[in-house]
């Protein structure tokens, strides 16, 4: 799981900018890309 997260982080960070208040949408977007 750690390996998948490490690979996904840059991918969803580039697609979904994270704002302090947008934690839930950001996590959802990360899961979708994974």
Curated annotation (Swiss-Prot):
GO terms for molecular function: toxin activity. Processed by the macrocyclase-peptidase enzyme POPB to yield a toxic cyclic heptapeptide. POPB first removes 10 residues from the N-terminus. Conformational trapping of the remaining peptide forces the enzyme to release this intermediate rather than proceed to macrocyclization. The enzyme rebinds the remaining peptide in a different conformation and catalyzes macrocyclization of the N-terminal 7 residues. There is a cross-link at residues 11-17 (Cyclopeptide (Ala-Pro)). The keyword Protein biosynthesis does not apply. InterPro entries: Amanitin/phalloidin. Keywords: Thioether bond, Toxin. This is Phalloidin proprotein.
């Amino acid at each position: 799981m750690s390996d998948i997260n490490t690979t996904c982080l840059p991918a969803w960070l580039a697609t979904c900018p994270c704002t302090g208040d947008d934690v839930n949408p950001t996590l959802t977007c990360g899961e979708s890309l994974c």
